[in-house]
Amino acid sequence: MTLFRDRGVVLRTIRLGEADRIVTLMTEHHGKVRAVAKGVRRTKSRFGSRLEPLSHVALLGWQGRGDLDIINQVEVIDTFRVVREDLDRMAPAMSMLEVVDQIAQERHGNPRLYEMLVGALAALAERDSPMVAPAFFLKVLALEGSAPVLDVCVSCGEDDSERLVAFDLTEGGVLCRSCRRGRPVSPGGLALMRRTLGGGLAGVLAEAASPVVDEVTALATEAMQAHLDRRLRSVRAGQVS
């Protein structure tokens, strides 16, 4: 077995036997890693509560010959305690973990996705912004090469913003008045999505809750679910309408 060091965010855990857990992490250099934490469920475990979902950790482990590695040592970088203790922040945080769990490839490094996840969790800990998760979804879609087309009608090429009035997941972007189908998109919603993908993230995260933010949240969530070809279990009931 090969010894490795890395940093990672715990995405999820499942029980293994009487005392162990299988921990899934998004790491900086090794992509998604599934590893056994031996004895983690014992009262006097050397890991304590450091391997719970959301924990950002530095780890030392052994890379196994099969699908599972073995965690040897763990040091906490951040527990994102503010997020854990606030249900309004925990829900979007868990949806972001779920997205990364679905997109990341095992043992295939994706430092940018790791950095985006850590950055999004830090932003959520800093402020209870309703735009953190939808912005994360849109940015991840862009990273995947699947960002929605927002500047021109994906059917006919119309580029007059005032005529772009609908969003169609099948087509992968906005549609004009002549081609419209799918769900309506408001000028404000279209502008906010463009700002999100255009680099004005600080201003986007400063947006207060509003009908436009709700609209973008629904659109971004639907776009991500279409990309994954599955519903996100962690998305609150009623969040997508």
Cite the ranges covered by each PLM segment.
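Non-catalytic alpha-helical scaffolds and adjoining flexible linkers that form interface surfaces
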Residues: 1-241
